[in-house]
Swiss-Prot record:
This is Malate dehydrogenase. It comes from Geobacter metallireducens (strain ATCC 53774 / DSM 7210 / GS-15). The gene is mdh. One of its GO terms (biological process) is tricarboxylic acid cycle. Catalyzes the reversible oxidation of malate to oxaloacetate. Belongs to the LDH/MDH superfamily. MDH type 3 family. It catalyses: (S)-malate + NAD(+) = oxaloacetate + NADH + H(+). Gene3D superfamilies: Lactate dehydrogenase/glycoside hydrolase, family 4, C-terminal (3.90.110.10), NAD(P)-binding Rossmann-like Domain (3.40.50.720). NAD(+) binds at G10, G11, G12, Q13, I14, G15, D34, N96, I119, S120, N121. Keywords: NAD, Oxidoreductase, Tricarboxylic acid cycle. Its EC number is 1.1.1.37. Substrate binds at R83, R89, N121, R152. One of its GO terms (molecular function) is L-lactate dehydrogenase activity.
Length: 317
């Protein structure tokens, strides 16, 4: 049986971590494309040379030619400029939309049967543009945002409560920006509602609410927090790991329910836009969008987030 093939578009920080994770997990052979001559070749050679130490056996190739992504099962797009301190994700739209246009044309020509996972920011606009240019079915073009946002939310909760991150289940909806919607009501620790645990810890409902609001705020600004600390770029370990979870679910048909930037056609009252929602990811890409009820406050936050997505995406038209 032929190995799976994963192509990474963009040889920056995220691309490098993606390549290493793909190799360590032996998800398939990996190609890294970048326009900078020598960069993808050097990174892939560096990773390949540690195969005997880490015990992975896959083919790793760096390239400056889109032709080398032919036959890809999954293409992960990280190409684009990262944020700098003081910038929002939306500030990147003009330059990164030009880059995404070229990338999508390359994918369309050389990997027409692939699944595409977009990481580039501003995410909601970039995945929309990628799908529009490739013309691929909506189930085959998705964006990575919610897995990372939910992971950050879960981490903050675990640290606050002093419990294992493995036992926290959290979910975020909406766009990948300051208006994302961390769903407190659906967040739990080993099945126990998180607010109940916070209220028991502080023995004060008002204090518990205050602590949760701070964690929600931190989740919304988590990417910017990393940017401010790094000063020279944006997060790369965490978005790479999040994209790998999605890739693995597709390649291995795991049917995992993961927060995914999907094209909505009426779900959650949204029609014709890519928005973050829980979805089943399997061998057919997005196989099912998981719908559930939102209360009035949650719906209002979702509406605000979707409005921000629409404004950003419509600016591309």
């Amino acid at each position: 049986m032929a190995r799976k093939k994963i192509s990474l578009i963009g040889g920056g920080q995220i691309g490098g971590v993606l390549a290493q994770l793909c190799a360590l997990r032996e998800l398939g052979d990996v190609v890294m494309f970048d326009i900078v001559e020598g960069l993808p070749q050097g990174k892939m050679l560096d990773i390949a040379e540690v195969g005997p130490v880490d015990g992975f056996d896959v083919c790793l190739k760096g390239t400056n030619s889109y032709a080398d992504i032919a036959g890809s099962d999954v293409v992960i797009v990280t190409a684009g400029l990262p944020r700098k301190p003081g910038m929002s994700r939306d500030d990147l739209i003009e330059v990164n939309s030009k880059i995404m246009t070229q990338v999508a044309e390359g994918i369309k020509q050389y990997a027409p049967n692939s699944f595409v996972i977009v990481i580039s920011n501003p995410l909601d606009a970039m995945v929309t543009l990628c799908q529009k240019i490739t013309g691929f079915p909506y189930n085959r073009v998705i964006g990575q945002a919610g897995v990372l946002d939910s992971s950050r939310f879960a981490a903050f909760i675990a640290w606050e409560l002093g419990v294992s991150v493995k036992d926290v289940v959290a979910v975020t909806l909406g766009g990948h920006g300051d208006d994302m919607v961390p769903l407190v009501r659906y967040t739990s620790v080993c099945g126990i509602p998180v607010m109940e645990l916070l209220e028991r810890k502080y023995k004060d409902k008002a204090k518990a609410k205050e602590v949760m609001e701070a964690m929600v705020k931190r989740t919304r600004g988590a990417g910017g927090e990393v940017v401010a600390l790094l000063k020279t770029g944006s997060a790369f370990y965490s978005p790479a790991s999040a994209a790998i979870a999605m890739t693995e679910s597709i390649l291995k048909d795991q049917k995992r329910v993961l927060p995914t930037c999907c094209f909505l056609q009426g779900e959650f009252g949204v029609n014709g836009y890519y928005v973050g929602v829980p979805a089943v990811l399997g061998e057919n890409g997005v196989e099912q969008i998981i719908q559930f009820n939102l209360d009035a406050e949650e719906q209002a936050m979702m509406d605000k987030s979707v409005a921000a997505v629409k404004s950003l995406v419509d600016s591309l038209k």
